[in-house]
Amino acid sequence: MKKQRNLRSMAAQAVEQVVEQGQSLSNILPPLQQKVSDKDKALLQELCFGVLRTLSQLDWLINKLMARPMTGKQRTVHYLIMVGLYQLLYTRIPPHAALAETVEGAIAIKRPQLKGLINGVLRQFQRRQEELLAEFNTRDARYLHPSWLLKRLQKAYPEQWQSIAEANNQRPPMWLRINRTHHSRDSWLALLDEAGMKGFPHADYPDAVRLETPAPVHALPGFEDGWVTVQDASAQGCMTWLAPQNGEHILDLCAAPGGKTTHILEVAPEAQVVAVDIDEQRLSRVYDNLKRLGMKATVKQGDGRYPSQWCGEQQFDRILLDAPCSATGVIRRHPDIKWLRRDRDIPELAQLQSEILDAIWPHLKSGGTLVYATCSVLPEENSLQIKAFLQRTADAELCETGTPEQPGKQNQPGAEEGDGFFYAKLIKK
């Protein structure tokens, strides 16, 4: 039996680590969830994700409710109050329970002397809620994005930026990829129906299914046997453009955690696939995914800027470059991205992408296909990146995705319920 812990204080400390220390919630949350009971795991996740999704609103409210910000060793209390406000605003937790548990969180973070302060701030919000929210809804903070990102979205998409920001603030659906080597999509949907769940096929991507209601993976028919993988529909779109064939030598560059590596092998089981990533730790997930699906690929640790170090002079029939990027297209899945990224990161990422493209291009065979993909919505990483590459690379030709003036295909967050994603298909003359 797991020791009863105060979830509100755990959520506050997790959010503090993201915002103040720049840590990823994906790294922080799983170990915390191991410390709580199964029934509390979902609530802990909801509190962490929810506070990060609405952080700018909660911050604005605290500044209105408190004369002075909490600093130094008391900073965790600031985030604990955020957790309390989030519950009052966005959850069905009865207000008295939300207040009581949040106030008790002060003991867990060793600040019992501040219980009265926390209680007072939250009760003041309850009294002034209508007035405060009316004022908040006139401010830029209502878009729940940092100002630098809003400015970039406004510049790139003068007509769409508000809908993009709104889509980023929604909860994402759960998309699955059916392993066509085991089941047709229709036959797996029948199994899902027998298990008491409902799914909907994607109109364009032949392996994609959206669950009506997200479910734990162990409840999915055949998950442990490799019949199905969790992967957003937009990420599955990479295979439409890559179109891998049996017998080909295919490189999946920046491959971790391996979702696209295994998709290549589902589409072309007899392809010779090399999966490369710079992060040795994340490569363990590539091995895990290959093992669960019963597949084989050559997995290597390597830097995409220096391919000769890990593949010599080898050339490939097809290359999938899922480039390192700002991840501004998947904010709805990872709301911490809004607070981890900085404006200065964008030119640095664009430079890295450019270096990888230039370095890997000589390793594509003549007549071969390279698909450049990101989960970003920013032109500097996408259309402008490919436009510049085409201008400096005489033997590169854009194929099927956009025009030389506006290269690539940009999926916006929420379009057909998928993530924000960019694809450009290039052919080597």
Curated annotation (Swiss-Prot):
The EC number(s) attached to this protein equal 2.1.1.176
Q: Name one GO cellular component term.
A: cytosol
Tell me which UniProt keywords the record has, alphabetically.
Cytoplasm, Methyltransferase, RNA-binding, rRNA processing, S-adenosyl-L-methionine, Transferase
A Pfam entry, by short name = Methyltr_RsmB-F
Among InterPro entries, the record links this protein to: MeTrfase_RsmB-F_NOP2_cat (IPR049560), MeTrfase_RsmB-F_NOP2_dom (IPR001678), NusB-like_sf (IPR035926), NusB_RsmB_TIM44 (IPR006027), RCMT (IPR023267), rRNA_ssu_MeTfrase_B (IPR004573), rRNA_ssu_MeTfrase_B_ent (IPR023541), RsmB-like_ferredoxin (IPR054728)
GO MF, one term, reads: rRNA (cytosine-C5-)-methyltransferase activity
What does the entry give for GO biological process?
A: regulation of DNA-templated transcription; rRNA base methylation
Write down the chemical reaction(s) this protein catalyses. cytidine(967) in 16S rRNA + S-adenosyl-L-methionine = 5-methylcytidine(967) in 16S rRNA + S-adenosyl-L-homocysteine + H(+)
Which locations, inside or outside the cell, does it occupy? Answer: Cytoplasm
Active site at 375 (nucleophile)
Chain positions recorded as S-adenosyl-L-methionine binding sites: 254-260, 277, 303, 322
Q: Which family does it belong to?
A: Belongs to the class I-like SAM-binding methyltransferase superfamily. RsmB/NOP family.
Protein function: Specifically methylates the cytosine at position 967 (m5C967) of 16S rRNA.
Give the matching HAMAP family: 16SrRNA_methyltr_B
Q: What is this protein called?
A: Ribosomal RNA small subunit methyltransferase B
* Native species: Shigella flexneri serotype 5b (strain 8401)
List the gene name.
Answer: rsmB
